Amino acid sequence: MRVLALDTTTREGSVALVENKRIVDVRRGDGSRTHALRLPGEIVTLTDAHRWRLSDIDLYAVASGPGSFTGLRIGIATIQGLASVHRRRVVGISALEALAYAASADLVPGARIAAWMDAHRRDVFTALYQVTGEGPFSRAHLSAIEDAAVSSPTAVLARWQLLDPAFSATFVGDGAVLYESAIVATSPANVVKPLPDLAGAIGVLAEERASEAVAPSAIRPLYVRRPDAELARDEKLLAAKESSKGM
């Protein structure tokens, strides 16, 4: 089975080709250009490099979120368009789950993986997993301890320490790198890994779950948090109310 996978949850994002659960190639995007401008060219360049035609793709995969609202919309719309034209189905994969799978290869059963993505506004998108020991990229390989959420780094760390006073984990993602000092200060046993290119993991996970593929129109983004524009509007309204109370 041939899979084309996209990740547009970060500024750079990535595009990958996967065949028979093997990553053929994965390429990071040019963060200086918007996803909308560069994605079509990046997809054509990658498929041409391996002499794949878009009509040869059996399954399309995309990071469903969380991440940049604009990036998510562009990535999902791109995959929907390609899948619709070629009459293929689509699998959406959580970027946090893909992060955890990408980081789990060298971890022993029982190890915990904390996927952290920078959510801006001094927050992180987080999810917590535990390695079960089943085959890599199988659904049973990771067990979700805590599903996708958004919060401040200190609040997340405090919550997990309440879960286990001796809490430690492998933290992965750009959010983990950004807040590495707080993570390591909480426990010297915590390990921080950088954000990998996710499209490859997304493609392998999608092929593993091909039986769950849906029609292109059925893919829905995983936002976790409301758009920044709405949050900024609410903050202005709250500030205006507080100001009026003081008059």
Can you say where each PLM-predicted feature lies in the sequence?
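N-terminal beta-alpha supersecondary unit
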Residues: 1-66
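Surface "functional belts" at beta-alpha junctions
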Residues: 22, 34, 89-197, 213, ...
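Residues at secondary-structure transition points
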Residues: 30-38, 69, 73, 77, ...
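Short, hydrophobic alpha-helical segments
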Residues: 47, 206-214
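DPxDG-like acidic metal-binding loop motif
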Residues: 61-95
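Short alpha-helix plus adjacent loop in nuclease-associated cores
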Residues: 98-102, 202-208
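Nucleotide/phosphate-binding catalytic cleft detector across ATP-hydrolyzing
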Residues: 233-247
